[in-house]
């Protein structure tokens, strides 16, 4: 419960009001709530104030473009409406006050980068649990205490949802939380008032240019987590070109590399000296500021070696002993829809992965090749109503690294599938090894029935998702379920 006057530092109202929750969606308002009316990219919350009042809102905070109106109070009936200049920009701070600064009372780790956010945030929470902590996670797969995750709409929720969720986790006994921090979330100031014990940067490759317009804007949004927000420990992938540039400007950051010859300079550091890949993962010989050793990874692919080193480095920076981390690492498990291997006797191996950018697809195919003695198949599509420029690049990657390719539906949304396919096909030099099967289930069936035992089939793009968005409809669809049906 928070009093209206305390939240906005207002002079005493005649009748101060105790508020239960901050709510952005007028359809979810309950009696006693504060309705937050912000001007979003598509919808202006001010248009829904009447609806919120009808649902029982006890007060409203309304975004105004006039600085002269800031913190002025009007009334609709008996309900106070507080005008707030640049409300969206300051919403994280308001929610931080409303929910009593939950991130100050948690070990909070933010993870940003184009690829690897989900794997790293899930591994952080999983490893924290193995170390005896109660962990929660927020991100693409969902939000909640580890093992009790509820599906989420966006990678990074609204400023209010984040603070509210952190408060819920804290009251449920969590002492550790990992959160995926998207470029949208950073650009829109949704994590502005969070107190990060650490932040991890994975990599930066082409994605979301439909929103950011340029790679420079995209990189600048990511960088804010390390230069403008309250972040104590900065863990950077030094093998990424942007990460390496940032390290030159961040002397207090920790450098993590898979390059044995990496020159660490003045930074704290972690680097792989030798990596032995095998069917069950990898054995990573490393040296670091905290000591040397061998880390046994249960995850396949070189990029997952990088992910795991970033996670272990972060936990080492918190003071967890190296021997404890190496002992507990053996119990780590893979992440749903992230290089998830499905195998049946005498059948091709199927790998389901979320790869939906050119860089991620390349890394997934290279990782799949490690486990392929026959031909490597790649099934992929591209999302509709999204960055068209990456579609031919995805085709180029598939053609370079796979022997057999099937182009299919991803989430076409409201864009014609034929347009998406045309954009993808424009990237192929030779169509001889390419098939187009728009129906995703039929594409998976064809590959499984055509491939032989030593082949590997990478089904890319959807990962953990159990739906397809076709038009404005969301229909049930799971790559894993379809693959299992045809492997049995």
UniProtKB/Swiss-Prot annotation:
GO biological process: cell division; cell wall organization; peptidoglycan biosynthetic process; regulation of cell shape
Family annotation (InterPro entries): Mur-like_cat_sf, Mur_ligase_C, Mur_ligase_C_dom_sf, Mur_ligase_cen, Mur_ligase_N, MurE/MurF_N, UDP-N-AcMur-Glu-dNH2Pim_ligase
Major place of residence: cytoplasm
Residues reported to bind ATP: 113-119
Gene transcribed to yield this protein: murE
Protein name: UDP-N-acetylmuramoyl-L-alanyl-D-glutamate--2,6-diaminopimelate ligase
Gene3D superfamilies in the record: Mur ligase, C-terminal domain, Mur-like, catalytic domain, MurE/MurF, N-terminal domain
Cofactor requirement: Mg(2+)
Binding site for UDP-N-acetyl-alpha-D-muramoyl-L-alanyl-D-glutamate: 24, 26, 41-43, 154-156, 182, 188, 190
Organism: Haemophilus influenzae (strain PittEE)
Keyword list, A-Z: ATP-binding, Cell cycle, Cell division, Cell shape, Cell wall biogenesis/degradation, Cytoplasm, Ligase, Magnesium, Nucleotide-binding, Peptidoglycan synthesis
Post-translational modification comment from the UniProt entry: Carboxylation is probably crucial for Mg(2+) binding and, consequently, for the gamma-phosphate positioning of ATP.
Chemical reaction(s) catalysed: UDP-N-acetyl-alpha-D-muramoyl-L-alanyl-D-glutamate + meso-2,6-diaminopimelate + ATP = UDP-N-acetyl-alpha-D-muramoyl-L-alanyl-gamma-D-glutamyl-meso-2,6-diaminopimelate + ADP + phosphate + H(+)
GO terms, molecular function: ATP binding; magnesium ion binding; UDP-N-acetylmuramoylalanyl-D-glutamate-2,6-diaminopimelate ligase activity
Compartments it resides in: Cytoplasm
Family annotation (NCBIfam families): murE, PRK00139.1-1, PRK00139.1-2, PRK00139.1-4
